[in-house]
Each structure stands twice: as C-alpha cells, then as structure tokens.
C-alpha cells in the first residue's frame, strides 16, 4: 500500500525508535519464555547449517541497506527512487522497470487520494467505493421521493475532495495523469504532429486525424519520417513530440494537479433482478410498456455517479456489482444490435444525456437482453433545453417522444452510442464518431468544472457546449507577442510571460475592443460592453496569434466566457493589420443558416475591404527597444523608428522562428532575446556601416523618404560628446578660430586619411594609423570618430582618448621646450586682430603709410637684379635676422615688400631697400617728424652711396665666396661655422613654404612702450654724425634702414659703429650685439647659421664702399 508523506519526521522517528526498542524487548522476552515449549519442534543442526535466508524469504536483510524514509508522494517499491511529480515517477518506471510497467506502477484512485498498483487499486475500489445495492425499491413513490431528496439536493456531507489532474490550456480534468496527457496530445498538439502524419491509403490535407476515426483508420496512420506505425493517434503524437520534436517538457508543463469537490458515491438504484426476471431494474412492469407517455428517469447525478467508474483498466473485478444489470430498450432508448457478443465482450449503451457506460457482458447476450420485439426507441433529450439548466445527463422528465424517432429493430451496432446525438443542432465529430467495440480499455473521462459531473470524453464536449456554452468575447492586445503556446512577450515591458500569468498582465495594460478601440481592465466590463454595443458584430477568423482563455465569472450564477485575445501577428505586420481583422469591418447582419455564414466568412481575411492595413490605424505605440512613445500610424512609425533610431528592421529568426531584428547595414539577424545594448555593441563592429556611408549619398535610400527634421540621422546619435574632446573644442573655439564646429549630419564624412585596409591590422598598427591621422587632423569631429571606430574596429572612447592624449602631449612639449616659430609676425595684420600679447620696446614696429613708403622707395632700389642668385641668401639672411630680433613666432606669414627700381641721375649701383610689412603698424606716429628727419638725411645719403662698376664686381665675388669666408672667419661667440650650410638651407625652405605652427606658449613677450619711440631719434642723430662711409652705407642700405624701423637701445648702436671702425670684421660684432640672449641656447646655433650668408653679403658691400 502507498503511504502518504508524513510531517515532523524528527519527532516521529525518535518515538518510533523507542517503540521499536520496546517491541523488540517484548518479543525477546516472549521468545525466552516459550523457547522451552518449541524445542521439540526445533530441527537438527544439519538443517540449520544448510539453510539460508533465501530459503526462508526472498529478501535478505544483510544484503540491503536501510533506506531513509522517503517523504515524496511517489515512491518506487523496487528501488530507492521517489519523486514529487507523477510524470517523473512514471518516466522512471518506464525507463528502469519497463518489464512489468502496467502491473507495478502506482495509479491514482479516482475517488480519493489513495495510490496503488493496478490489482490493489481494483480491490480498493471494490471495497471502499463500490455502491451499495441494498436500496429499497418497493414502490415507485418511495423511489421518487428518495430521488428528490438525495439526488436533486445533495447535502454538504455528501461531498468529498477528489485529486485530479487538469489541462492548463482548457477545462479538461481527469484523475489519471495518462488520460490528461493523451488529451493534450490529441487536442493541443495536432499542429505539431500534422507534418509527420501520413495515411497508408490516402493523404489528408494537413495530416491531422479526426477524433472520430475508428480503430481501423487509426492503425493505418504512420510517421512520415521514420515510418513508425502506432496503435493510436495519441501514440503517434507522443512519438512525434518525444522523438522528433523533443518538446515533451511542454506537455508536462501543461498538466496541473489539484483537488476538486465531487459528490460522494451513493448506492446504485438499479437492483439486479432474479435470473428468471427479464424486465429487471426493480421497476413496475407498467413502466416498460409505455409507448408515448411520460418517462421518469433517475436523477442525473445519481445515475452518473453510480454507473461511471472512470478506470479504463478495470475489466471485471471492479464492477462485479454490475454483472447482472439488465437494461430494457423502452426505458433508456437503447437500440437493438444486429449481432451477439460473447462472454467478456463489452458494449457501449447510450444512456440519456449522451453518457454511455461500458458494461461487461456475461453469459447473456445482447439479443437476449434487448429483444427485437420492442421496436420503439426513445431519443431522449431531443428537445432544446434552456441554457440555464444545471444538469444534462438523463434529464428526460415530461419529455414527449415524437413519432418520427421510431426506429426499426434491425439497426447497426455503430448507432448504439448515438442515442442522444440528435439533441444538438451540429454535434462535433467527437459525439458522432462511432467508437470501436473494444475501446472500453482506453475510455477517457472528464469532470465538468462547473457542475462537477463526470462524463466520458466524447460526451463532455457536447455537454459543455449545450449546458455551459461560453460567451465568446474578442479582444485585442497589440503589445503581446505570442512566442509559442506557453510563452508570450510583452512589448511594453520587454519581458517574457508564462501562460498562467499572461491574462493578469494583459489586464494591467488593458484589453482593447476590436471594433471601437475602447480599453478595459476588467473582463466582466468588457463582456458587458460587447453585449451592449457590439452584439451583432461578426468576429474575424481565428489566427495563429490568437490567445484563448476559458473563464468563469461569479455573477450570482456561473457565466462562462471564452476570451479570444488577438496579439501581435508577425505575418500580417506591417502590411496588414496586426490587430483583429474585423476591427474596422462594417457590421454584417447575421444570417439564419450558420453553414452559409461560415462559407461567407472564409474570404474575409483575403478581401481588401475587410482587412484594413494596420498602418492606417493612427494612435500611440511603444518602441520595444528604447520604450519611446511613437505617434502616428502605428506600423509606419514603429518601422521608421526602428530603422532610423536603432538601424534595424523586423524579421523572423530563421532557426528560432521568433520575432527578432535584422541590421540594415550588414543584414545580420539578431537573436530573439536581444536588447538595445546588443545593437549598440554590434554597430561598433559592423563592417557594413562604413561601406554604407563611405562617400555615398543616402538621400535616395528608402530610409530617407519620409525623414523629418526632428528625427535622428541614420547613425544612432548621442547627445553628449566625449568630455576631453568637448572641452578642447570649446577652448579652441573661444580663441579666434575661423572654422565652425557645426556640421550637417546629412553630408558624408570625409576623412583626412583613408582607413581602408587597416581593420585587420594589429592593435598597435591601428594606433599608429590614428597617430598619422592626428598629424593631419588633430581635432576630428564626432562623426569622424564614429567612422574611424567603425572602420578600424575600435571603441570610440579609445579613439577620442588617443587624440586627446596626443593634444595634451603637444601642449606639454610646447611648455617644456619653449619652441619658437622662425617666421616673424605680420604686424600689419596682427594689429588688425584683437589680442592680449604684450611686446617689449625693442620689438616695437612702426606703421608707415603708402606715401612714406614711396618716398623711401626713391632712396633705395632693388638689389636682387644686380646681385643675381647670390642675393637670395642675402634676403634670406635679412629675413632670419628679423626672426632673431623678434625671438618668437606668430601664426601669420611675413610679407616682404620689395620696392621697384628708380633710376637716379648718377651712375649708382642699385642697393636693395627691403621694407618688411610686418614692421608696419595700424597706428601712425608723428609723420611730420619723420619727414623732417628724412629730408635732412637725403643729401648725405645720395652723395655717399655712389658706387662704381668695380665695387659691384667685388660684391659679386664676395657673394660667391661667402661660404668660404664663413669657414675661415673665427667666430667670437664660439658658434660653429659649419652650421651655416644647414642654416641657409633652412632659410630657403622657410622662404618657399609656409611654416607649420605649434600651439603653445610664446617664449618672449613684448610691450609697446613710449621709451622705444624716444630712443629712435637719438639713434638716428648718432648715425648722421658718423662720417665714415661705412656708417653711411648702413644708413642708406636696407640694413641701415632697419635702424629706422627697429628701435634699439642707443648704446647697442654705438658699440656697433665703434666695432665697425676698429675690427676687420665689424659685422660679427654687430651680429653679436643684436642676438637676443633670451631665445634659449637651442636656437644659438640656428641663429649663427642664419647669419652666415648675411655677413658674407655685408662684407661685399663694405669692401665696395671702402674701395670707392
């Protein structure tokens, strides 16, 4: 026997140990007392030595280990296995102990919680649940009163809890786990098994086998894949699910276990008659002779509970009390059968209410029990009954039998189970299908959850449709996406929901009416709305995305509602409506003939008038990825948002067969459990992003057709920029930068360097490419960074940090090494710009108008034409002398103004007059003072500058030998003369090309002071006092003119003039006196090199003047 689990095992085992000890002591004491009495029966030592435990019993306690107490309800008696679930217990038995599966497996008692094997369960039912046949049947009045009191009004004490298994998809219940599982195979997995099912003789449309097929047809089906031939349709479905589809866990998940209250079994009112009595049943003889009168039957509750023993494996042991039951044709409408049945065979006799009962036959035959003389059968229940009737089986009181139902005595055996099939206008195939004669061993029973009645399976559907017909209520939930029969996904919450909690979750968001789009959070209110407003509306066809719920509302009386919720349909989206197809249909008046209406409803889905595209349904929807609220046409807005914002389109996963998304760049399919972060991660490495945007105009792409200015660009944009990049851009833009940061996102990104071919390089190689890109473009835009990241397979943050670090390093280098820009300021342009730079007095520049420059031009002529190629170094040396004097750079290029040649009266050698434009200021000084000073100096200048042809030739020779002189001259400041070559080369380079400036701190700061202006006249007066022709040469040449523009201290110019008289090379002293010592040692050699060609040319000039 099966023992139920026990709680508080600790305390029980302590007491059990004590009890066992006491019992063992008592037994030992009893043995000691009676050992002398049994000595005469004791065998000799030979038998004791040659006897083992196997001779005494089959179980040897020394060979086994004491097993722990198993608390789980389903324990295997052959091994230590135990389980909480019957499915696991049964699978264990099938796999481990399959040799005696049918006889040893535990079965559930349909009336109580007792479990045992088959044989023990039959004995249990016979002893404890067999109806008592000692009920009085003396008179019909007593029988009626008892029926009234006991049957129609059951007492509370008559109810008992019954453990049953139930199907979670519908209201099917059965005490046996196997029956419920077969029901699920047959009812809910036809679509799974349909592709595998094939018939031997013919091919069905979808492979499904009707429920009403007989045993011969069921034996003809087989599996297409492995040619497995099962015994029944359920066996084939089970084979497909477990062997091919491997989704047996879904079947297990659909089976639940609960306790229901059922009426306790009462004594059977049918009394077995004496053998000589042929009319039986204890009723008066006059009842059997009624032709067209009123027939009173037993109460349905009593009859079903006495005659229905839902054990398909009970043959004769459990129902011996029914062996001698005789049924008469006129009482119950059982039609005659045209053949005899032997002993042990059974026949299904149709009772009132379409509840056939399997009754094993004994020696009597059916012909003997059902004589053909009574040629009238009564089809009970032929009248239409009100829907509020609580009982269906055997309710035939005061029912007149129409004469059209009189049948001939010779009818086929297949009609025996269809006595009451005419009660419904259109019975389903389960009620009309002829069952096989030997089908009693697999008869399935179901308990009606509303009236707690137990019916055979083929009767249950008819009973439920007739007595408890559910009210169909359509609803729409576009935010629910049906994954499969057990799981759905809420697109609002982006979470997966099981079937048991799905309805409650949908009521939180609300269910919409498919006709008027009203939203309800209560099923009862929605049903009332459908009854009041849309009572004549026709429902659309049921699709694969429809979820069905069978509900019972407690509103005084039971109200059954069959809720049909249409969810997001992937096949119809977005072209067709993903909501209900009939949401915008015009009301179709109901037709009187339901068959014609069904044929008219077939083309509803394909007709363009009925199926309104869902994109025309304007409203609000929610993006399942970023939960943004979208307005406008729902399908268009969602598809457009997914393409533009997330760069995906909806599709079906080719393997998972679930809704997922596909990248619009590389057409890669995401998995069904992806999120928005998955898309972001993919776009970083997606190679199709760069290919799609590399120089192509995407205005003609489909994604650009309906783009509005408010929508984001194709690339997923981020509102914030990387912080180091953003700060640097702001700092640079606050300074005067002509470039603008704003850019049009529609324009294609043009990169400074093409990253193609570098995506497969190493990490260091890609970083070196970024360094090269930094040298070209140190300030990339956000879209450039995104494109570089996509092309080089790098993170955008890595690229931004790389550029930021490079910029910081440049700034640090400028601060540490104090570099100077070799080209001087263009002061004329610089004075036009508002700046905060402060210049010292020695770097003060004066601004001369064009009139003064023309006057000065008359005094000087260009020397380049006469000096030839050697004068290039001369001008270069002057250019770099200006840079030395400035000592710092500027982001402006120098512009040198060369005055045109002016012929003079005397034959003179043209002397260059170079006026640097950078030396001109916007502010004008006192021009009168300048004019007076120039007039005073004109006479002496024109007189002393006359040069002959011979000095000119000497100047050419001196220019040609300037390099040789540089090597011979000993420099006083210790500078290496060998640096003159590179210096001159550098001069030419800077003359031809513009300088690349580095952003950094300027090494020297200057200010414009009045002291510099006051020192200029003194310097000029000192220069005019000098009578030396060399000094006059300085004043009239371009280098002497520098004195007028570059205002030096007076002492410096005095030292320069004295050195010119004393030393053979006065230009060296002049150069040393003008070198800026603040420029740093790193620029000394460069300055010396720059000055070499200048001194060579100056030497030539001085020689010519001295020889003259």
From Swiss-Prot:
Predominant localisation class: nucleus
This protein's encoding gene: Adnp
Annotated region described as Binds to beta-catenin/CTNNB1, given as residue ranges: 1-685
Coiled-coil features, chain-numbered ranges: none
Annotated DNA-binding residue span(s): 753-813
Subunit structure: Interacts (via N-terminal region) with beta-catenin/CTNNB1 (via the central armadillo domains); interaction is direct and stabilizes CTNNB1 by modulating its phosphorylation by glycogen synthase kinase-3 beta GSK3B.
Modified sites of kind N6-acetyllysine: 1041, 1048
Induction: By the neuroprotective peptide VIP.
Sequence segments annotated as region (Neuroprotective peptide): 354-361
Cross-link (Glycyl lysine isopeptide (Lys-Gly) (interchain with G-Cter in SUMO2)): 39, 72, 144, 155, 203, 231, 266, 274, 278-279, 311, 335, 367, 407, 426, 599, 605, 615, 620, 631, 657, 698, 715, 727, 730, 744, 806, 828, 834, 913, 928, 941, 1022, 1041, 1048
Superkingdom assignment: Eukaryota
Tissue: Expressed in the brain, with a higher expression in cerebellum and hippocampus. Weakly expressed in lung, kidney and intestine, and expressed at intermediate level in testis.
InterPro entries linked to this entry: ADNP/ADNP2 (IPR038861), ADNP_Znf (IPR045762), HD (IPR001356), Homeodomain-like_sf (IPR009057), Znf_C2H2_type (IPR013087)
Composition skew (Basic and acidic residues), residue ranges: 143-154, 851-880, 939-959
C2H2-type ZnF: 74-97, 107-129, 165-188, 221-244, 446-468, 488-509, 511-534, 621-646, 661-685
Modified residues annotated as Asymmetric dimethylarginine in this record: 348
Annotated keywords: Acetylation, Chromosome, DNA-binding, Homeobox, Isopeptide bond, Metal-binding, Methylation, Nucleus, Phosphoprotein, Repeat, Transcription, Transcription regulation, Ubl conjugation, Zinc, Zinc-finger
Location of this chain's protein in the cell: Nucleus; Chromosome
GO biological process entries: cGMP-mediated signaling; estrous cycle; intracellular nitric oxide homeostasis; negative regulation of gene expression; negative regulation of neuron apoptotic process; negative regulation of synaptic transmission; neuron apoptotic process; neuron differentiation
Residue ranges with Acidic residues bias: 928-938
Compositionally biased intervals (Polar residues): 393-422, 691-709, 977-988
Listed name of the protein: Activity-dependent neuroprotector homeobox protein
GO molecular function, a single term: copper ion binding
GO CC terms in record: axon; chromosome; dendrite; extracellular space; neuronal cell body; nucleus; RNA polymerase II transcription regulator complex
Annotated spans, Disordered: 133-154, 360-438, 690-711, 851-1037, 1050-1108
Phosphoserine: residues carrying this PTM: 98, 408, 412, 607, 708, 737, 804, 875, 877, 885, 888, 904, 959, 961, 1077
UniProt-listed Gene3D superfamilies: Classic Zinc Finger (3.30.160.60), Homeodomain-like (1.10.10.60)
């Amino acid at each position: 026997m099966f023992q139920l689990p026990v709680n508080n095992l600790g305390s029980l085992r302590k007491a059990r140990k004590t009890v066992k000890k006491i019992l063992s002591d008592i037994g030992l004491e009893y043995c000691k007392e009676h050992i002398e009495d049994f000595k005469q029966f004791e065998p000799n030592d030979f038998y004791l030595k040659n006897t083992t435990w196997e001779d005494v019993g089959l179980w040897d306690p020394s060979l086994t280990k004491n097993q722990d107490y198993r608390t789980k309800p389903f324990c295997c008696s052959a091994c230590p296995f135990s389980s909480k679930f019957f499915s696991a217990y049964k699978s264990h038995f099938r796999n481990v102990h399959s040799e005696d599966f049918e006889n040893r497996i535990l079965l559930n008692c349909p009336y109580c919680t007792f479990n045992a094997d088959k044989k023990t369960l039959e004995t249990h039912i016979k002893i404890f649940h067999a109806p008592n046949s000692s009920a009085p049947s003396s008179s019909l009045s007593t029988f009626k009163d008892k029926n009234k009191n006991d049957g129609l009004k059951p007492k509370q004490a008559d109810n008992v809890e019954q453990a049953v298994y139930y199907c979670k998809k519908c209201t099917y219940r059965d005490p046996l786990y196997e029956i419920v599982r077969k029901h699920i195979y047959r009812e809910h997995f036809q679509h799974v098994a349909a592709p595998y099912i094939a018939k031997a003789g013919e091919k069905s449309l979808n492979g499904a086998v009707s429920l009403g097929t007989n045993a011969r047809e069921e034996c003809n089906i087989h599996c297409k894949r492995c040619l497995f031939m099962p015994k029944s349709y359920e066996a084939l479905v089970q084979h497909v699910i477990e062997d091919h589809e491997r989704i047996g866990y879904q079947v297990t998940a659909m089976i639940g276990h609960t306790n229901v209250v059922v009426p306790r079994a009462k004594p059977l009112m049918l009394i077995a008659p004496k053998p000589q009595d042929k009319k039986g049943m204890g009723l008066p003889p006059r009842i059997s002779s009624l032709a067209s009168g009123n027939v009173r039957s037993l109460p349905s509750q009593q009859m079903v509970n006495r005659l229905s023993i839902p054990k398909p494996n009970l043959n004769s042991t459990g129902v011996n009390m029914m062996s001698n039951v005789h049924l008469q044709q006129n009482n119950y409408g059982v039609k005659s059968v045209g053949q005899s049945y032997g002993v042990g065979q059974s026949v299904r006799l149709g009772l009132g209410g379409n509840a056939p009962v399997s009754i094993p036959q004994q020696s009597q035959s059916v012909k003997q029990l059902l004589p053909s003389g009574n040629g009238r059968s009564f089809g009970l229940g032929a009248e239409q009954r009100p829907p509020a009737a609580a009982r269906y089986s055997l309710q035939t009181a005061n029912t007149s039998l129409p004469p059209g139902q009189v049948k001939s005595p010779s009818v086929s055996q297949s009609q025996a189970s269809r006595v009451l099939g005419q009660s419904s206008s259109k019975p389903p195939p389960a009620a009309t299908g002829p069952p096989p004669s030997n089908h009693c061993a697999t008869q399935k029973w179901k308990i009606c959850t509303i009236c707690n009645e137990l019916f055979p399976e083929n009767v249950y559907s008819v009973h439920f449709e007739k007595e408890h017909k559910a009210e169909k209520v359509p609803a729409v939930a576009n935010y629910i996406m049906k994954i499969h029969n057990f799981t759905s996904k809420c697109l609002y919450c982006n979470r997966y929901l099981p079937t048991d909690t799905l309805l409650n979750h949908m009521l939180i968001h609300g269910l919409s009416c498919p006709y008027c789009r009203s939203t309800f959070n209560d099923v009862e209110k929605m049903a009332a709305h459908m009854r009041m407003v849309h009572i004549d509306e026709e429902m659309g066809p049921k699709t694969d995305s429809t979820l069905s719920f069978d509900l019972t509302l407690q509103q005084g009386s039971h109200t059954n509602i069959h809720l049909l919720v249409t969810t997001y349909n992937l096949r119809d989206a977005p072209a067709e409506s993903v909501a209900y197809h009939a949401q915008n249909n015009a009301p179709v008046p109901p037709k009187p003939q339901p068959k014609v209406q069904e044929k008219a409803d077939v083309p509803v889905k394909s007709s363009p008038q009925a199926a309104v595209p869902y994109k025309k349904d304007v409203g609000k929807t929610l993006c399942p990825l970023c939960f943004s609220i979208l307005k406008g046409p729902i399908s268009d807005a969602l598809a457009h948002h997914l393409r533009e914002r997330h760069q995906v389109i909806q599709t079906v996963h080719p393997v998972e067969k679930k809704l997922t998304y596909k990248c619009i760049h590389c057409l890669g399919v995401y998995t069904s459990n992806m999120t928005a972060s998955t898309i972001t991660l993919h776009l970083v490495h997606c190679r199709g992003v760069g290919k799609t945007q590399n120089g192509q105009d995407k205005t003609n792409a489909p994604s650009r057709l309906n783009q509005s200015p408010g929508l984001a660009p194709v690339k997923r944009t981020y509102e914030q920029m990387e912080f180091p990049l953003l700060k640097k851009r702001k700092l640079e833009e606050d300074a005067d930068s002509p470039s603008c940061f704003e850019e049009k996102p529609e324009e294609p990104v043009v990169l400074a360097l093409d990253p193609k071919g570098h995506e497969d390089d190493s990490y260091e190689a890609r970083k070196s490419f970024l360094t090269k890109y930094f040298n070209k473009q140190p300030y990339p835009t956000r879209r450039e960074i995104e494109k570089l990241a996509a092309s080089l397979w790098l993170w955008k943050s890595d690229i931004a940090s790389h550029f930021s670090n490079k910029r910081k390093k440049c700034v640090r280098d400028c601060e540490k090494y104090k570099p100077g820009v070799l080209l001087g300021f263009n002061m004329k342009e610089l004075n036009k710009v508002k700046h905060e730079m402060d210049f010292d007095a020695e770097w003060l520049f004066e601004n001369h108008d064009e009139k003064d420059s023309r006057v000065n031009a008359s005094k000087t002529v260009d020397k380049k034409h006469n000096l030839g190629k050697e004068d290039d170094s001369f001008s270069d040396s002057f250019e770099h002398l200006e840079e030395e004097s400035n000592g710092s750079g500027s982001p402006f290029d120098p512009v040198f103004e060369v005055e045109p040649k002016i012929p003079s009266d005397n034959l003179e050698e043209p002397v260059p007059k170079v006026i640097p434009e950078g030396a001109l200021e916007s502010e004008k000084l006192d021009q009168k003072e300048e004019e007076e000073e120039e007039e005073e100096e004109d006479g002496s200048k024109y007189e002393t500058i006359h040069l002959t042809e011979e000095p000119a030739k000497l100047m050419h020779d001196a220019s040609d030998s300037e390099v040789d002189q540089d090597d011979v001259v000993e420099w006083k400041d210790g500078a290496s003369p060998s640096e003159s070559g590179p210096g001159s080369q550098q001069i030419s380079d800077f003359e031809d090309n513009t300088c690349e400036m580095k952003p950094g701190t300027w090494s020297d700061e200057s200010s414009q002071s009045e002291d510099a202006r006051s020192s200029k006249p003194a310097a000029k007066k000192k220069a005019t006092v000098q009578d030396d022709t060399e000094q006059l040469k300085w004043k009239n040449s371009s280098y002497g003119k520098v004195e007028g523009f570059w205002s030096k201290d007076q002492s410096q110019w005095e030292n320069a003039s004295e050195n010119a008289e004393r030393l053979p090379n006065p230009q060296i002293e002049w150069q040393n006196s003008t070198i800026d010592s603040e420029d740093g040692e790193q620029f000394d050699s460069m300055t010396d090199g720059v000055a070499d060609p200048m001194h060579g040319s100056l030497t030539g000039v001085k020689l010519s003047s001295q020889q003259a």
